[in-house]
């Protein structure tokens, strides 16, 4: 296995561990999610380039679109929680229910 794949997998695992350990604040969780999505994007791009299959190039672009949507929804939730409670704790998400 080339070293670049090991580095990308290590980046994904570090982001996953950050998501597991620092899950009390929404901002740190969003940053860890973005790190995971970035490493998945790079890994899928490298695999699509190695496959030499033209339709495989759609997968990284679709993943990038979903990552942008996830970031937009996460930032909207962060703004909503910050305006309502003044804090960015994840346990405040349960208080937004009607």
Swiss-Prot record:
It is a multi-pass membrane protein. One of its GO terms (cellular component) is respiratory chain complex I. It catalyses: a ubiquinone + NADH + 5 H(+)(in) = a ubiquinol + NAD(+) + 4 H(+)(out). Disulfide bonds: none annotated. It is found in: Mitochondrion inner membrane. The keyword DNA-binding does not apply. One of its GO terms (molecular function) is NADH dehydrogenase (ubiquinone) activity. Its EC number is 7.1.1.2. One of its GO terms (biological process) is ATP synthesis coupled electron transport. Belongs to the complex I subunit 4L family. Core subunit of the mitochondrial membrane respiratory chain NADH dehydrogenase (Complex I) which catalyzes electron transfer from NADH through the respiratory chain, using ubiquinone as an electron acceptor. Part of the enzyme membrane arm which is embedded in the lipid bilayer and involved in proton translocation. This is NADH-ubiquinone oxidoreductase chain 4L. It comes from Trachypithecus obscurus. The gene is MT-ND4L.
């Amino acid at each position: 296995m080339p070293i670049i794949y090991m580095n990308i997998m290590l980046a994904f695992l570090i982001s996953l561990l950050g998501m597991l350990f620092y899950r009390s604040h929404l901002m740190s969780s969003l940053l860890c999610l973005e790190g995971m999505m970035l490493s998945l994007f790079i890994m899928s791009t490298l695999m699509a380039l190695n496959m030499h299959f033209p339709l495989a190039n759609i997968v990284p672009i679709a993943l990038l679109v979903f990552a942008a949507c996830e970031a937009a929804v996460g930032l909207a939730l962060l703004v909503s929680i910050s305006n309502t409670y003044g804090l960015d704790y994840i346990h405040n998400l349960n208080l937004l229910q009607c």
